[in-house]
Swiss-Prot record:
Radical SAM core domain sequence ranges: 42-234
Cofactors demanded by this protein: [4Fe-4S] cluster; S-adenosyl-L-methionine; Mg(2+)
Similarity comment text for this entry: Belongs to the radical SAM superfamily. 7-carboxy-7-deazaguanine synthase family.
Keywords attached to this entry: 4Fe-4S, Iron, Iron-sulfur, Lyase, Magnesium, Metal-binding, Queuosine biosynthesis, S-adenosyl-L-methionine
Binding site residues for S-adenosyl-L-methionine: G102, S144, P145, K146, Q195, S196, M197, D198
Binding site for Mg(2+): T64
Job of this protein: Catalyzes the complex heterocyclic radical-mediated conversion of 6-carboxy-5,6,7,8-tetrahydropterin (CPH4) to 7-carboxy-7-deazaguanine (CDG), a step common to the biosynthetic pathways of all 7-deazapurine-containing compounds.
InterPro entries in UniProt: 7-CO-7-deazaguanine_synth-like, Aldolase_TIM, rSAM
Bound cofactor: record note: Binds 1 [4Fe-4S] cluster. The cluster is coordinated with 3 cysteines and an exchangeable S-adenosyl-L-methionine. Binds 1 S-adenosyl-L-methionine per subunit.
Pathway listed: Purine metabolism; 7-cyano-7-deazaguanine biosynthesis
Name assigned to this protein: 7-carboxy-7-deazaguanine synthase
GO MF annotation list: 4 iron, 4 sulfur cluster binding; carbon-nitrogen lyase activity; magnesium ion binding; S-adenosyl-L-methionine binding
Source species of the chain: Rickettsia prowazekii (strain Madrid E)
KW Metal-binding (keyword) present: yes
């Protein structure tokens, strides 16, 4: 069954966690669940989410809980993904795995990605673009850049050629998030999405939606909606 949205959200209260090394046979995992991908390039696809623990940033609008994690063996992860991909008749009906967080690139995820690909899953990574890992070229990487102390963090040069799409979070009342910035996407003709920020305030959210639509029409960017929130699923 789809999991309901957790009412606890980070909102920048998470510790900034360090980058992990290792062979990737064990990963810090917050949760693994099946749902419908609610946003971005695979919106609407039945998906299995692997939510990894910890992040190297602490964004004060973060609407996800990712600190309640455990160190799990990769074989356990793969076994759970396989079981979740099967329907009531034991047929595989879910073919997309989304690895998110937190920040997935904080951990050595290359082995997990390759093993998922070997099992004929599509793999999508959601990252903030500040870290780099060497990943199989078949992996879809969606980058959602965040604002640092001096404006938007540029996407790492070594990551840019591998990115499938860039997603900008839009807020009318936070100046830094009220624009579509240049963070390296134009040089590689990377598709751009805009998505309104969820600020847990109906008036602010309506204003954010209006601005996101305006920016999409002005720039040609695609509008991304968090449809999973409308459906009440994670």
């Amino acid at each position: 069954m789809n999991q309901r949205i957790n009412s606890y959200k980070m909102f920048g209260h998470n510790p900034k966690r360090s980058i992990l090394s290792g062979d990737g046979t064990k990963l810090e995992v917050q949760s693994i669940f099946k749902t419908i991908q609610g946003e971005g390039i695979f919106v609407g696809y039945p998906s299995i989410f692997i939510r990894l623990g910890g992040c190297n940033l602490a964004c004060n609008f973060c609407d996800t809980e990712f600190e309640d994690f455990k160190l799990i063996d990769i074989d356990q992860i793969l076994n759970k993904v396989k079981n979740l991909s099967l329907n009531s008749k034991n047929a595989k009906t879910i073919n997309l795995v989304v690895i998110t967080g937190g920040e997935p690139m904080r951990q050595p995820i290359g082995l997990l990605c390759q093993k998922l690909l070997d099992q004929d899953f599509k793999v999508q990574i959601e990252t903030n673009g500040t870290l780099y890992r060497s990943l199989p070229k078949e992996v879809f990487i969606v980058c959602s850049p965040k604002v640092g102390k001096t404006g938007y963090n540029k996407i790492r040069e070594d990551l840019l050629p591998q990115i499938s799409a860039v997603k900008f979070i839009i807020s009318k009342n936070i100046v830094e998030y009220s624009i579509i910035p240049e963070v390296g996407q134009s040089a590689y003709d990377i598709p751009v999405f805009v998505q309104s920020m969820d600020q847990n305030d109906k008036r602010l959210n309506n204003e954010n939606n209006e601005l996101a639509v305006k920016l999409a029409l002005e720039s040609g960017a695609r509008l991304s909606l968090q449809t999973h929130k409308f459906l009440g699923i994670e």
